[in-house]
Amino acid sequence: MFSGSIPALVTPFRDGAFDAPTFARLVDWQVKEGTSALVPCGTTGESPTLSFDEHYRVIDCCIEAAAGRVPVIAGCGSNDTATAIRHMRHAQASGADAALIVAPYYNRPSQEGMIAHFKALADASDLPIVVYNVPGRTVADISAETMCKLAEIPTVVAVKDASGDLARVTVHRKGARHGFCQLSGNDELWLPHAVMGGAGCISVTANVAPRLCADFAAACAAGEWTRALALHDRLFDLHKAMFSDTSPGPVKYALSRVHDWFSPEVRLPIIPASGASRAVVDAALASAGVI
């Protein structure tokens, strides 16, 4: 259902408030640069710091700015099932194409609990669901076996896997229903993920280098692996630089270097990228030819 380069969009702030005009400008630039779909209100979008009203404004602004040119996969996850349902219902009413649902974090549900969570979401809304597995943040890990069971739910259409376990790509491909979409959640693993059957990546780096990431995705889709490897190598330092300090500090700083209209402002408890991180980002932007 989804493929290619899909940025997990940053949320721009100015003087502490959501900067809607800048966000709309960012979305328009992304689409024009070849981005395949958009994810507002994910981790990179600092969703834990957004009020419900802000969360919905970000989703609505993204849908309005995208104007039907590319799909919008709205971040709707929560460790409270009722809250996730509320987010999904708003996203669907606003015209989102799918919901990104992170594994319930902090309260550490069992595998059976996670299945029950996603079934409850599917029962409450027919909005397509992209399951997001990122055990490094959530602690709870959706096992490959559980993921294959979740894929039996008709509206669970894809997984964003950021476990770092590439073997899961094969397990999912062999065990999930035909056509189930696999998206990488790790930029630096996008190439091997694609070789093993992945359709694309929900990317941090694509915030900053959307054209390069779109070109890389196109090379993978065409099976042009020599070209894909060359682009992977060109982007690799930038992939790593995006996590040279706590995300999204580095990617917001990088965007401020690419566009003078973008502010690197973040919200507590995230703080701006350190001097050392900024130096790493500057070097990576230069080596990739982004600046």
Curated annotation (Swiss-Prot):
Its EC number is 4.3.3.7. Keywords: Amino-acid biosynthesis, Cytoplasm, Diaminopimelate biosynthesis, Lyase, Lysine biosynthesis, Schiff base. Disulfide bonds: none annotated. The record marks T43, Y106 as: Part of a proton relay during catalysis. Pyruvate binds at T44, I202. It is an enzyme of class 4 (lyase). One of its GO terms (cellular component) is cytosol. It is found in: Cytoplasm. The keyword Cytoplasm applies. It comes from the Bacteria. The keyword tRNA processing does not apply. Pathway: Amino-acid biosynthesis; L-lysine biosynthesis via DAP pathway; (S)-tetrahydrodipicolinate from L-aspartate: step 3/4. PROSITE patterns: DHDPS_1, DHDPS_2. Homotetramer; dimer of dimers. Belongs to the DapA family. Catalyzes the condensation of (S)-aspartate-beta-semialdehyde [(S)-ASA] and pyruvate to 4-hydroxy-tetrahydrodipicolinate (HTPA). NCBIfam families: dapA. This is 4-hydroxy-tetrahydrodipicolinate synthase. It comes from Sphingopyxis alaskensis (strain DSM 13593 / LMG 18877 / RB2256) (Sphingomonas alaskensis). The lineage of its organism: Bacteria, Pseudomonadati, Pseudomonadota, Alphaproteobacteria, Sphingomonadales. The gene is dapA.
